[in-house]
Amino acid sequence: MNTLYLGSNSPRRMEILTQLGYRVIQLPAGIDESVKAGETPFAYVQRMAEEKNRTALTLFCETNGTMPDFPLITADTCVVSDGIILGKPRSQAEAIEFLNRLSGKQHTVLTAVCIHYRGKTSSRVQTNRVVFKPLSSEEISAYVQSGEPMDKAGAYAVQGIGGIFIQSIEGSFSGIMGLPVYETVSMLQDLGYRSPLSALKP
């Protein structure tokens, strides 16, 4: 079975890679996720993925005394509405604020992926556009009370209850979840790593 290191605690990214047939070893890497003054959402999300990768790689080398044998993947996702980055809500009140901002409008979801393998590092940002239906205060309140928004960028989960708010998606469903499958596998292959299909050959 093909093996990957995932520099993340995200159960959603873990699920995506596992469903592709990879054996995944998690190497969580905590970093400062503050936005720099004047930083664009695109630059921010790419910097986050790259910093997570460097941090996870350093921790691996310090712990094991060697470089990883398998690709190390990190990613970061941000929701952008009217040019403003909506991260993970810090309170129920902020989750309500985010959902009111997204209600009845189009927003952008950016997911950056960074992969290190055999001394080479590649990063890419994938862009998605999502349209929310108009949300009532009752819908927002009930959703926030469910607890689902509290650890999600933009205060919603496309693969969960939050999916009922979405009228349309332009882009990648897996990218909105947190790890775009097409881009990730393409990057792995460009770096010389095996396709998930290679494990299925008789």
UniProtKB/Swiss-Prot annotation:
Keywords: Cytoplasm, Hydrolase, Nucleotide metabolism
Entry EC no(s): 3.6.1.9
GO cellular component term of the entry, any: cytoplasm
Alphabetical list of SUPFAM superfamilies matching this protein: ITPase-like
Catalytic activity: dTTP + H2O = dTMP + diphosphate + H(+); UTP + H2O = UMP + diphosphate + H(+)
UniProt keyword Cell division, yes or no: no
Pfam families (UniProt xref): Maf (PF02545)
One Gene Ontology molecular-function label: UTP diphosphatase activity
UniProt main location, coarse: cytoplasm
GO BP, sorted A to Z: nucleotide metabolic process
Cofactor (UniProt): a divalent metal cation
Catalytic site positions: D76
Function (record text): Nucleoside triphosphate pyrophosphatase that hydrolyzes dTTP and UTP. May have a dual role in cell division arrest and in preventing the incorporation of modified nucleotides into cellular nucleic acids.
Family according to the record: Belongs to the Maf family. YhdE subfamily.
Protein name: dTTP/UTP pyrophosphatase
Organism from which the protein derives: Neisseria meningitidis serogroup B (strain ATCC BAA-335 / MC58)
Origin organism lineage: Bacteria, Pseudomonadati, Pseudomonadota, Betaproteobacteria, Neisseriales
